[in-house]
Amino acid sequence: MEILNNWISGINDILWSYVLIIMLLGCAFRFTFKTRFVQFRMFREMIRVLGDSANKAHEGEKHISSFQAFAVSLASRVGTGNLAGVATAVAVGGPGAVFWMWIIALLGSASAFVESTLAQLYKRKGKESFIGGPAYYMRYGLGLNWMGILFAILISVTFGFAFNSVQSNTICAAMQGSFGFDPRIVGAVLTVLTLAIIFGGIQRIAKVSSVIVPVMALGYVALASGIVLFNITELPAVIKLIVSSAFGWEQAAGGTIGAALMQGIKRGLFSNEAGMGSAPNVAATASVTHPVKQGLIQTLGVFTDTLLICTCTAFIILFSGAPLDGSVNGVQLTQHALTLEVGKAGGIFVAVAIFLFAFSSIIGNYYYGEANIRFITPKKSVLYIYRLLVGGMVMFGALASLELAWSLADITMAFMTICNLVAISLLSKQAFLLLHDYIVQKRSGIKSPVFDKNKLPELKDKAECW
């Protein structure tokens, strides 16, 4: 097991130290400038379209609304990356890692806009709802079926297996730390609950996510806000520490700026998924009047995840004065920090929050896998086998080591992200055209723009569902 972990860590170091940092930041900067900072100038419009109901004029009653698509994607985003991932980033990369998480969210949200807009453009009609995602725009946009199948395999393994093992591992660690529960029992219960929901299909997943996600996010933000207000006099010092740790001379001399940068980008991507190619799978299912609407919705999801919830975790840890020497790591660091702030109840709260956050992620992660298994083959038997394997990986995660679980997630996430970034870079001009069309309609006085493919000849043959 140690040999496997060392081999995987070696590959991860190459991918995350060079390849992905260049690609993620390069795409993020390009999309930010090409869209003229869409993630900032259209923030009010993001809030407005969040309340749009499903467009049922032609598609029927089963398609999900913008908010439900937002909730399912946020269910995947808001998970252990927000509590355990941020803690790991701060423990390994120092407080400066938080700064780089902010940067990758602010810039990377433009990548989220492009990928989700493209997913809407290339979506297809399924039996229950629309279907789509990177595999579809690789097949129908680039004409590269092999690339679509490769991505579908990567995301099915990454989210259904690797990420879900991380979520399960973190839940078990939190429950064992707070209540002394046996990981085997917790893992068995998680497996049963997971299988019960994922055999219910996207409609059940959407309904469960739209209830769990707002409740858990608001509860966690409320607690963190209380801690920030209680320590308000220390807030300037904490922010100064974050920024100085990202650029300071001491960090440069010690070589930790690179660690902060790498951890910030790695854990930031694991948490907000901007440019990874995951959120477009659920963005495509939404029934909207214009592809840009889901691009805006998923951009808002990145902000909610990183700038709000991840920041809450970082502040809780830094306010508490918990040791960042590696003696406490992962979710245990977050639990320890909250215990220092509000007493034993804090650790219990984190255990409950982790269960809700991570379990909702397991549900959302599974959907990404299912959507891509359907892309590879229509056989129901394959889908049923995949569901059972997902359940098996949830149980595996409960028993595996934390280090191996994270390493597997990092390497599969890296390969699928590279695949997706190449695709959206090649197709990005189409997203820019759609954004221009949307803005022109808004400026002409149309409150809720409607996409008419006949007005954009360049996209007419691409938009089957429009």
PLM regions: where:
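Flexible loop linkers connecting adjacent transmembrane helices
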Residues: 37-64, 88-98, 102, 110-142, ...
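Alpha-helical membrane segments and immediately flanking helix-loop junctions
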Residues: 57-92, 118-121, 127-135, 139, ...
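Transmembrane helix-loop junctions in multi-pass membrane proteins
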Residues: 4, 34-39, 81-86, 95, ...
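N-terminal alpha-helical transmembrane segments of multi-pass membrane transport
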Residues: 1-80, 91-96, 426-466
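Extracellular loop-to-transmembrane helix junctions
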Residues: 9-48, 91-128, 304-310, 411-421
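Membrane-interface loop-to-helix entry segments
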Residues: 23-30, 34-47, 169-175, 181-230, ...
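Helix-loop-helix module between adjacent transmembrane segments
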Residues: 27-32, 104-128, 134-135, 139-169, ...
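Extracellular/periplasmic helix-exit of transmembrane alpha-helices
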Residues: 113-122, 127, 223-241, 249, ...
